[in-house]
Amino acid sequence: MYGRNTIFRKATIEGYNIVIVQEGDCISEEIKISILQCGTMTVLPYEADIRRNNPLEKRIVLPVNAFLVEHPVHGNILIDTGWASNVNDILPKYLKHFYRPQITPGQTAKEQLAAKGLRPEDIDVVLLTHLDIDHTCALKDFAGKAKRIVCAELEYFYSPRYVYKIRQVWDTWIPYIKTEDRIHYRSSTLGPVGRGFDLFGDDSVLCIYTPGHTDGNFIVMINKSPSDRFKHHGDGDVGSSFAVIAGDAAFSETNLNEHIVPGYGFNRKLQLKSVEFLADLRKSSYCCGMFFSHSSSDRTEIFF
C-alpha cells in the first residue's frame, strides 16, 4: 500500500482537515512521547504471587502512568488517564483497599499537561487501552473537552463476566464515551490473536488487540511512517521506526525478559501470548522504545 519512504502531511482544503500521503523521506517533524506518572498503587505485580500463601506480603508500590503522544499530523493523543485528584472519593471501599491509590498535587494528567501548556481542549484523542479504574479514573477531566474519546473494550464489557461488575467503576467512563467512538477490532496479521484497528486509517497509530489482562485490552504502536504492518507482519521485520505503549499487557520489562504473566488477569494463557508478542516486538531493529503503565523509566520523554 505505502512504500517505506512514504510520509504523512496535514493540509486544509476548503475548510476540511485532511492527511496527504506522499512519497519522500520519513516525517521530518519528530514524534514525541511523554510519560505522565499520575500517582501510585500498591498491588501484586506477578500472577504467581497471587496464588502463594500470604500473598499480601508481596505487594509493592507501582507507578500509574498515562502517556502523551505529540504527533506532527494527528496532534495530541492522550493514552489512558491515571488517577484523578479525588480518587479516594471515587473508588468504593473494597477497591481502595485493593489499589491503595496515592496521588499528590500536580500529578494528575490534567495538571501535568497544563505544565506543558496544554488544556484538555487541546487533546485530539483520548485512547483508553481498557476500562480498569486506574486507566479511566481521570477521564472526567477530559470529557466534553477532548475532541474524541476512543475505547474498544465496550463490546466485552457488556458480557456476563462478573469481574467487570466489581473491578471497573462504571461512573468513570460510561457517561463519557459516545456511541460513535466505540471501536471494534478487525482482522490483521499483527498481534497475538491477529486483531486490532488502525486509529486514523493511515497506519500511523495502530491499536493491537492483546487480550488476557482484560478481555478487550490493547497496546498502541506509533509508527514513524506508513509500514503496512497490519497486512504484512507475517513477512518479517517490516516497516519503519516505531514505539509501543504496552499498557497493562505487561507491567514491566521483567514480564518480557522472564516471560512472567502480570497479576490480576482474566486469562493467563492469553496474557502469556500477549507478553510473548511484546517480547518479539521489542527485539525488532525498528523499535525505538516500549513503555508500560506500571513501570518506572529513566526516560520520561522519547523523540523519534
Regions found by a protein language model. Name each.
Residues 2-63, 196-199:
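Basic, amphipathic N-terminal segments that precede the first structured/catalytic domain
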Residues 20-21, 101-118, 122, 152-208, ...:
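Metallo-beta-lactamase
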Residues 31, 40-111, 220-247:
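Conserved beta-strand hairpin/beta-sheet module of binuclear metal-dependent hydrolase folds
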Residues 35, 66-71, 77, 184-233, ...:
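Core dinuclear metal-dependent hydrolase active-site scaffold
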Residues 38-39, 81-83, 131, 155, ...:
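Active-site metal-binding loops of divalent metal-dependent hydrolases
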Residues 42, 85-87, 157, 251-253, ...:
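Feature marks short, surface-exposed loop/turn motifs that line or immediately flank catalytic pockets
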Residues 93-150:
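Active-site metal-binding motif and surrounding structural segment of the metallo-beta-lactamase
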Residues 98-111, 221-304:
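Cap/insert and terminal regions of metallo-dependent hydrolase folds
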